[in-house]
């Protein structure tokens, strides 16, 4: 940890800008416009894995997007709880084998490709094929909140949860969301938009406190497009306030008050991609049961020491021990 006083400064920090006055109205109306379940296909796959049913799920998203997800359900006569997993920025859904660990505990797992990134989901009328990840944060920001690219990603999350909750195999009272970086952000958004989500695990969540990102000068690959917008389109920042006001509608910290279920967060204090201060802006706005674990020596990197076991315990109610105790 480079600055021992960092935690003290962040413990009450809630972000640079406030939630737009019409924020909840905006999102409630966007959800209300999704009047019914979208068209979807759930196709079983034969992977010769005993005791697990494997499916590919595709559905029609907003703006004619096509959304792809992988689904595992334990083979049982009982309805199963489900964990929704979301991947990092520019990535894709879990490999099939990565999903198996949770089925051992009796959980279904759903892992979704974010449209326009590296998986099979596509963006319909705006960019029908291929990876369009660069520029997704600011896409639509000049036109206004309704045109934001991430608005459609967030609505994909809501519809995915509704589809899965409607399936006969699923216990829709026991749904959880999980992810890291962009995935952590989407796990929180899923809980903020769909009250079916009762538990969330978010590791170093992305997409928070955009004005602070600008002030810090975070030119990491994840936020590069934000800085390129100003450098090459608005070098005197004449549109900064308007752009920030628009991006506020997809800022994760602004969804925090909508989350009702338990939230567990993990942050690394050396994170120079999703700076800790922007993560605290989310956590300090949460009004639900919550826990925040800090890893002082970690940056925006794989957290493989004890973290996966803790996440498993949080999501599955298991009691995996983290330390060897000699008996």
Where do the model's predicted regions map?
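N-terminal cap/lid segment of alpha/beta-hydrolase-fold proteins
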Residues: 33-77
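Gly/Ser-rich "nucleophile elbow"/oxyanion-hole loop immediately N-terminal to the catalytic nucleophile
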Residues: 136-181
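Histidine-bearing beta->alpha loop at or near hydrolase active sites
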Residues: 289, 294-310
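Hydrolase active-site cap/lid region
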Residues: 189-237, 294
């Amino acid at each position: 940890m480079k600055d021992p006083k960092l935690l003290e400064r962040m413990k009450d920090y809630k972000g640079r800008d406030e939630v737009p006055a019409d924020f909840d109205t905006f999102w409630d109306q966007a959800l209300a416009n999704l009047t019914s379940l979208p068209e979807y296909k759930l196709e079983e796959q034969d992977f010769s894995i005993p005791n697990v049913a494997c499916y590919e799920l595709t559905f029609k998203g907003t703006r004619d997007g096509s959304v792809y997800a992988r689904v595992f359900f334990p083979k049982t006569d009982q309805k199963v709880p489900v964990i929704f997993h979301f991947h990092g920025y520019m990535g894709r859904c879990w490999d099939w084998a990565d999903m198996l660990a949770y089925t051992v505990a009796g959980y279904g797992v759903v892992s979704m490709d974010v449209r326009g990134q590296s998986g099979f989901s596509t963006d319909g009328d705006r960019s029908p094929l291929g990876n369009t990840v660069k520029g997704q944060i600011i896409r639509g920001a000049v036109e206004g909140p309704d045109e934001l690219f991430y608005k459609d990603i967030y609505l994909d999350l809501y519809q995915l949860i509704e589809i899965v909750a409607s399936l006969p195999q699923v216990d829709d009272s026991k749904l959880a969301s999980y992810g890291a970086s962009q995935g952590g952000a989407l796990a929180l958004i899923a809980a903020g938009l769909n009250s079916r989500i009762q538990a969330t695990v978010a590791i170093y969540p992305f997409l928070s406190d955009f004005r602070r990102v600008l002030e810090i000068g975070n030119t990491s690959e994840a936020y590069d497009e934000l800085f390129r917008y100003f450098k090459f389109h608005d070098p005197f920042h004449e549109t900064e306030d308007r752009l920030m006001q628009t991006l506020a509608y997809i800022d994760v910290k602004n969804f925090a008050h909508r989350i009702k279920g338990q939230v567990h967060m993990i942050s690394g204090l050396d994170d120079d991609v999703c700076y800790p201060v922007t993560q605290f802006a989310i956590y300090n706005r949460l009004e639900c049961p919550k826990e925040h674990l800090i890893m002082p020596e970690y940056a925006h990197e794989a957290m493989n020491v004890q973290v996966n076991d803790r996440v498993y315990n949080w999501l599955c109610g298991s009691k995996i021990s983290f330390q060897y105790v000699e008996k």
